[in-house]
């Protein structure tokens, strides 16, 4: 039977995600971000709620991406997630994209010319951001055209790069309805961004989310819930450069701006430059919020939930993969658990995120 991997945030889970799961084949394994997501913000509902949403709509196994994989630029995010899924035995990767390209050929190009392509990236001017350099690489070596703001398209290329040489078949699915960051409400499939923005509109949420009641009754958070804590962290840390990816320039810009702002987005606007994109700044703010320092990734894989098919698959890979089903006195990943503790501070109704929690089971 085909074992299909899906890399996701489900922030929150909506009809477009269900469409993706419906079009995936065989056993469907989801590698999902935990309580903080790739663009550098807290997930609107916790990882357990999002895992349950996925399992109730076709996923067979949901595992958690460690913090240092989940909150990273596209290439590191894709590489870490593909590594997790590869160890779980996937032979196909299904993902949504704004533009269905021949990703398999693109992966082959990278497999053949990776050294030359990475050397090209290194040779580009330092005033370009890493995403800009990566785009120029794909334009030159694979003839990819970049038009508009298409994060899923960019992630698709990162997945192709991460899967190069691994024998994983790439299965892109055309994104349905609204674009990734679209705020449009008059569409057949609403974006996660739009659902976060219009979360109080119950009719809208009911229309575009298969688990709308679970979502609406679960504790929710946003950057606003952590703003004061973030400001405290910036003001009281004597050496911000001890935090992952914070250099002297970023530290100086943060210290100068933090007393002049009243929201996280204002801080992002003041600190971001051509070289430091807003997404990168948000990720850096997330690192500061949780006190992240450079750390190695866990070798084991944390399971959030499974169906009966998923449970059988877990048993089949258990001898070759270290699986963590319950986090107790022995930690799974200290940084991820530290981030979860901070996440819980955002809403007093949030449940314990690790200790005593067992995988969700669905029939």
Curated annotation (Swiss-Prot):
It comes from the Bacteria. It is found in: Cytoplasm. The keyword RNA-binding applies. It catalyses: cytidine(34) in elongator tRNA(Met) + acetate + ATP = N(4)-acetylcytidine(34) in elongator tRNA(Met) + AMP + diphosphate. One of its GO terms (biological process) is tRNA modification. InterPro entries: Rossmann-like_a/b/a_fold, tRNA(Met)_cyd_acetate_ligase. GO terms for cellular component: cytoplasm. ATP binds at residues 7-20, 96, 152, 175. Keywords: ATP-binding, Cytoplasm, Ligase, Nucleotide-binding, RNA-binding, tRNA processing, tRNA-binding. Its main location: cytoplasm. Pfam families: HIGH_NTase1. Its EC number is 6.3.4.-. GO terms for molecular function: ATP binding; ligase activity, forming carbon-nitrogen bonds; tRNA binding. It is an enzyme of class 6 (ligase). Belongs to the TmcAL family. Catalyzes the formation of N(4)-acetylcytidine (ac(4)C) at the wobble position of elongator tRNA(Met), using acetate and ATP as substrates. First activates an acetate ion to form acetyladenylate (Ac-AMP) and then transfers the acetyl group to tRNA to form ac(4)C34. This is tRNA(Met) cytidine acetate ligase. It comes from Streptococcus thermophilus (strain ATCC BAA-491 / LMD-9). The gene is tmcAL.
């Amino acid at each position: 039977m085909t074992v299909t991997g899906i890399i996701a945030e489900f922030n929150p889970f909506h009809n477009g995600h269900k469409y993706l799961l419906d079009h995936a084949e065989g056993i469907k394994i989801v590698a999902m971000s935990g309580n903080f997501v790739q663009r550098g913000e807290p997930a609107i509902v916790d990882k357990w709620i999002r895992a349950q949403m996925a399992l109730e709509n076709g996923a067979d196994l949901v595992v958690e991406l460690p913090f240092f994989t989940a909150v990273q630029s596209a290439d590191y995010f894709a590489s870490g997630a593909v590594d997790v899924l590869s160890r779980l035995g996937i032979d196909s990767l299904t993902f949504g994209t704004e533009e269905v390209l021949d990703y398999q050929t693109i992966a082959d190009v990278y497999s053949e010319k990776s050294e030359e392509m990475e050397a090209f990236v290194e040779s580009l001017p330092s005033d370009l951001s890493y995403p800009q350099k990566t785009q120029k690489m794909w334009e030159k070596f694979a003839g990819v055209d970049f038009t508009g703001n298409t994060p899923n398209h960019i992630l698709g290329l990162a997945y192709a790069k991460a899967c190069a040489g691994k024998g994983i078949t790439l299965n892109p699915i055309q994104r349905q309805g609204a674009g990734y960051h679209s705020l449009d409400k008059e569409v057949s499939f609403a974006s996660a961004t739009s659902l976060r923005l219009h979360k109080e509109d119950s009719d809208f949420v009911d229309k575009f989310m298969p688990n709308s009641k679970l979502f609406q009754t679960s504790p929710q958070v946003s950057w606003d819930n952590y703003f004061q804590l973030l400001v405290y962290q910036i003001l009281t840390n004597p050496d911000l450069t001890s935090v992952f990816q914070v250099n002297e320039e970023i530290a100086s810009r943060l210290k100068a701006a933090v007393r002049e702002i009243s929201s996280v987005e204002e801080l992002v606007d003041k600190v971001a430059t051509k070289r430091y994109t807003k997404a990168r700044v948000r990720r850096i703010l997330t690192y500061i919020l949780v006190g992240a320092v450079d750390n190695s990734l866990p070798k084991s894989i944390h399971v959030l939930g499974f169906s009966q098919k998923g449970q059988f698959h877990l048993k089949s890979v258990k001898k070759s993969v270290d699986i963590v089903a319950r986090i107790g006195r022995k930690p799974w990943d200290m940084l991820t658990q530290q981030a979860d503790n901070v996440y819980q501070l955002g809403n007093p109704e949030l449940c314990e995120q690790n200790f005593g929690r067992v995988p969700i089971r669905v029939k």
